[in-house]
């Protein structure tokens, strides 16, 4: 199995830690005035989603995780599994709710998502960075109400709740950033 040294650590690198695939979120190289240099690393375990901090001595090595990232189109949810399809081979994969996690509210049919596979099984689903969803429920925007420019909450067609500007009405389609759950703009 391939190994990677601590001086090659960077955000997004997938490594094995305690026989479990993990992704490096942040890597900080620390060189104290006295003693050996080390790397302080924030890691997210891909199976559980748990984030932890670990310290590696300078020169340590870690095994590269044997995970594959593939782009698949989201098809549907049958209540137990979320189904995805490869557009070139038409092969279908089913991911359980644990693999999808909080990202279920951003899954829109026929949108391309990135699935992380480990031993052929999906362990993580990443939706596209931006999705277009219809506003199904929100308070009406009253003309002249400019006090408190924080906006108002709006429920979208997938059940996600996002803060939107006062002018957004029910039935409009808006663009949302899935990484921060923020309103980006209206879709024309």
Curated annotation (Swiss-Prot):
It is found in: Cytoplasm. GO terms for biological process: peptide biosynthetic process. It comes from the Bacteria. May be beta-lysylated on the epsilon-amino group of Lys-34 by the combined action of EpmA and EpmB, and then hydroxylated on the C5 position of the same residue by EpmC (if this protein is present). Lysylation is critical for the stimulatory effect of EF-P on peptide-bond formation. The lysylation moiety may extend toward the peptidyltransferase center and stabilize the terminal 3-CCA end of the tRNA. Hydroxylation of the C5 position on Lys-34 may allow additional potential stabilizing hydrogen-bond interactions with the P-tRNA. GO terms for molecular function: translation elongation factor activity. Its main location: cytoplasm. Involved in peptide bond synthesis. Alleviates ribosome stalling that occurs when 3 or more consecutive Pro residues or the sequence PPG is present in a protein, possibly by augmenting the peptidyl transferase activity of the ribosome. Modification of Lys-34 is required for alleviation. Belongs to the elongation factor P family. HAMAP family: EF_P. This is Elongation factor P. It comes from Vibrio cholerae serotype O1 (strain ATCC 39315 / El Tor Inaba N16961).
